[in-house]
A protein has these predicted regions:
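Short, well-structured alpha-helical segments in soluble
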Residues: 7-19, 35-38, 210-219
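Periplasmic-binding protein-like
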Residues: 19-28, 47-50, 222-228
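Short, acidic/small-residue loops that bind anionic groups at enzyme active sites
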Residues: 37-64, 69-81, 248-261
Length: 424
């Protein structure tokens, strides 16, 4: 593309192709007039690739060419850095956000890792823009921090939020066959480490609900789900809601993260983490261990099977913490090694931001209470981490995934025009 006319044609082509992101590879000197129309028409994020063909010019060989025309051509091959300030200037004056990758075309791992992260971030933004998030039931009464503006969620991430009723799940549950229940119980024994205290009756209850959840997810093409419902005074709904944990754990493991307590913000965070391929399990503070300088974090309800340290245990609980009824629950720790925490934070000024921290899941004693829980260590220490994290006003839930992906989340925030704060 070396004329303004070709640039306009390219811009129309990119719009028709419905691209999510543009990579502008500056190969040599280019007039900004051959670039601006492309980006103006495409109206998508642009990454300027300021890539040199090599680490340096062979000065001796260059100066021995004895042909000024050839010398100019060879110099221009290394001239990609020259027009980048011009292009950046025009983008800024045109109100176009841009990002840069500076490095070498070949043998530059750091550079191409960065390009790869931009591609991953664009993919996740696309997933979120097309995601159907189910919101089933109602908010946990009195838990003010988790309430959110649904319109703001869709305006920021895109996608669709389907408001759903527990009654429908209870209705589907009644249609599940004995054969479906038997098959799902067998699945449970293959996937989970089931404690002897778990009765066949409870396993069958959970299996019926799990199969019904699959039907509900299929009907609404859900990519994530937030749920909570007391079910008090309605035996069918109480039966449903006291037997959802195993089924929700299976959904979470299969790319449909499920957040309890109707935590829609955290369902979004979990979907982001899962779309990056790092898991995304529902978690909150459990306790501080000042002796070992670690934080215990976890939650009741579903866990993410694919990021568990070993096989997830299933335990029978005679009472649910803050929930109606009794039934089966899962107990797991997140795989030992690097982890990333993510919270979608709703700001007082009416915007969403992404709060991120990188740490380590470490071995050690945890609470055997039939919940997910792990021990986390942070580079800034447990005390400072908690203080700094809380200072940004997140809800008390967050999503945890394996690996350090803070830089990828920062790029996602840039693509979505969201503020990103990294605590550590």
């Amino acid at each position: 593309i070396d004329t303004a006319e070709k640039a306009m044609e390219a811009g129309h082509y990119f719009r028709q192709a419905d691209v999510d992101i543009l990579f502008l590879y500056v190969t040599t000197y280019a007039l900004s007039s051959t670039v601006l129309p492309v980006v103006q028409k495409a109206k998508v994020p642009v990454i300027i690739l300021n890539l040199s063909p090599g680490a340096s010019i062979n000065y001796e060989q260059f100066n021995n060419m004895n042909d000024r025309t050839k010398m100019t051509g060879e110099w221009l091959a290394y001239c990609s850095a020259c027009p980048v300030p011009e292009i950046a200037n025009v983008f800024r004056r045109s109100g176009i956000k841009f990002h840069q990758v500076t490095g070498m075309l070949h043998d530059d791992k750091e550079c191409w890792n960065e390009v790869g992260e931009w591609i991953e971030a664009a993919k996740v933004a696309n997933v979120m823009a097309h995601n159907n998030l189910g919101a089933m039931g109602h908010y946990y009464s009195g838990m003010l921090d988790i309430y959110t503006d649904l319109t703001l969620q869709v305006a920021t991430f895109g996608g669709h939020i389907e408001i759903m009723e527990v009654d429908e799940l209870s209705s589907i549950r009644k249609q599940i066959t004995p054969q479906q229940i038997d098959k799902r119980v067998k699945d449970f024994y293959e996937i989970f480490a089931i404690n002897d205290e778990c009765s066949l009756h409870e396993l069958q209850r959970a299996a019926r609900t799990s199969a019904a959840l699959d039907e509900l997810v299929k009907k609404y093409r859900l990519g994530s789900l937030a749920y909570y419902y007391k079910g008090t005074g309605n035996a069918d709904n109480e039966d449903t809601m006291s037997s959802v944990i195993l089924g929700n754990s299976l959904l979470t493991a299969n790319g449909i993260p499920v957040a309890g307590e109707y935590e829609i913000k955290n369902a979004q965070a979990m979907k982001i983490m899962d779309s990056f391929g790092t898991g995304g399990s529902f978690t909150e503070y459990y306790a501080m261990d000042y002796a070992d300088d670690v934080i215990l974090m976890g939650h009741d309800g579903p866990g993410h099977i694919k990021i568990a340290e070993g096989k997830i245990k299933v335990r029978a609980l005679q009472v649910y913490h803050g929930k109606v009824g009794k039934g089966l629950s899962v107990e797991m720790a997140v795989k030992h090694g690097p982890v990333t925490l993510l919270s979608v934070v709703e700001r007082a000024e009416g915007k969403l931001m992404l709060l991120v921290a990188e740490g380590e899941s470490i071995a050690g004693p945890i609470l055997g209470i039939g919940n997910t829980n792990s021990r986390y260590k942070f580079s800034i220490g447990a005390r400072k981490f908690v203080t700094d994290w809380n200072s940004h006003g997140p809800a008390h839930h967050c999503a945890v995934g394996i690996g350090h992906i803070g830089s990828k989340i920062e790029k996602l925030g840039a693509l979505l025009n969201m503020e990103v704060v990294k605590v550590c």
